[in-house]
Amino acid sequence: MSKKEKNVEMGSPMKMPDLASYMQTVIEQLEADKKRSAAHTYTYALKSIAEFYGGAGMPMPVDEVFTPGRLKEYEEWMRREGMRKRKREPKGLSLNTISTYMRNLKAVYHRMVGEKVLPYNPKLFDDVYTKVESQTKRALELEQMNTLLCTDLRKLPSDLRCVLAYFLLMFLFRGMPFIDLAYLRKQDVKGNRIVYSRHKTGRQMTVRIPKEAMELMKEFKNRNPDSIYLFPILHKQESKKKRAGKVKKDKELYMDYLRALRGFNLKLEKIASLLLPGVKLSSYVARHTWATLAFHA
């Protein structure tokens, strides 16, 4: 009997993988599959639990991480100390963020169970928060939406005009997600229609361009002749990159989109304070409002 066989027969303990290296492999696979939103979320989940363990590079053996007690400690740490993305925000993560990170870990755990790395414990995540906390109602009332539609954009501060225009276009384009608006190409406009592929599903969509949307498109379209995009949302340094002989990769474009999304939502908050005090505006609101008003029409 070989030494290796003898160790297996005697039940020699198998070295457990480290969570950081394992999750990094998962993230790389998600990026290879172009599931960038999931890869982005997993990356932040990994940064969070690494911070809980003392910072990047600290060992995180999976058999220690995936225990009810350790997961509960991590949850309590996130509630108390988890760092916000914005520096000025207080410590402590929202319930939705805690749930997202825990559900990411749960998915990683199930992947390890499927690969026989860890045994299955059906109650492992029973004592930690994995629900999705319902947020403040996202859909606007008809009167509130009409307030935005009837706003004279010229009376807004210059940095807010295009933000409200994009929000209105998302609504007028049948609740188009911000990511699809950002990735719209000039060639997607076919007369009075837009034909494009959903970024999330790849499904081809066709939307009619209402008169109000056509006017907004003319005013806020991308005026860079070298850009393929309909609106100047992605990579404002596009022409500079081309002159330097550089072409942005998909991942870089997605990071540009995330930066644009953060700025978009921050400015929507300012618009809400000016036009709809007490109402929360975000990129999701246009989509939810269109769906709600269309349903009740």
Explain the meaning of each model-derived region.
Residues K131-R161:
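Long, amphipathic, Lys/Arg-enriched alpha-helical "connector/arm" segment
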Residues K155-S158, D256, N265-A297:
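Short, basic (Lys/Arg/His-rich) helix/loop patches that form interaction surfaces
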Residues I27-S37, K47-Q135, T151-R154:
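N-terminal core-binding DNA-recognition domain of tyrosine recombinases/integrases
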Residues H110-P119, M170-G191:
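Short, charged phosphate-coordinating catalytic segments
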Residues M1-K47:
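N-terminal DNA-binding module of tyrosine recombinases/phage integrases
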